[in-house]
Design a protein with these regions (language model features):
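Conserved C-terminal guanine-recognition region of P-loop GTPase G domains, centered on the G4
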Residues: 44-50, 73-143
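Conserved nucleotide-binding/hydrolysis micro-motifs of P-loop NTPases
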Residues: 36, 60-63, 92-96, 118-123, ...
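Conserved GTPase G-domain signal focused on the G5
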Residues: 16-17, 148-159
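Glycine-rich, highly charged phosphate/nucleotide-binding loops
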Residues: 66-73
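Conserved G1/Walker A P-loop phosphate-binding module
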Residues: 1-66, 80-81, 85
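Hydrophobic residues at beta-strand termini and immediately following loops
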Residues: 39, 143-145
């Protein structure tokens, strides 16, 4: 039996984590446009190149220091060592806020991928994140996505 890798999906509230989760797993996790929408973790599976992955959608958190029950759930899972990799989803329009969590996780996980989501909305606001440069600075793979339309998710699956 092949090994199933566990991938945590982390990020600030309201950055599209559940939309990314739904697109990758094919499930229908309820999504909403308000912080605190996901209050417990959800799990789903997907396969890529013959490998099976368990994707864990965590509640939104701003850092590993918990200030709410939702952040406690996310922080406990992220610090438990259960994840083989972490995808940190950030809002393309508000990178600074999301990078705090990404930098904290970068220090404690060997496999981190930064998913710069909501690229379509950022473009409408005239914001164009330098994703290639960001990847060089952080020394992690960076994937630009617009999860609602599915743009960039094939590349995210490969990472």
């Amino acid at each position: 039996m092949e090994h199933t890798y566990t991938v945590a999906l982390a990020g600030n509230p309201n950055v599209g984590k559940s939309t990314v989760f739904n697109r990758l797993t094919g499930l229908r996790q309820h999504t909403g446009n308000w912080p605190g929408k996901t209050v417990e973790r959800a799990e789903g599976y997907f396969s890529q190149a013959g490998q099976r992955f368990r994707l864990v959608d965590l509640p939104g958190t701003y850092s590993l220091a918990a200030d709410s029950p939702e952040e406690e759930v996310a922080g406990a899972f992220l610090q438990s060592g259960q994840a083989d990799a972490v995808i940190v989803v950030v809002d393309a329009s508000c990178l600074r806020r999301g990078l705090i969590l990404a930098l904290q996780l970068r220090q404690q996980t060997q496999r981190l991928v930064l998913c710069v989501n909501l690229m379509d909305e950022a473009a409408r606001r005239g914001v164009t994140p330098q994703t290639e440069r960001l990847g060089q600075l952080l020394d992690v793979p960076v994937v630009a996505t617009a999860a609602r339309s599915g743009k960039g998710l094939a590349e995210l699956r490969r990472e």
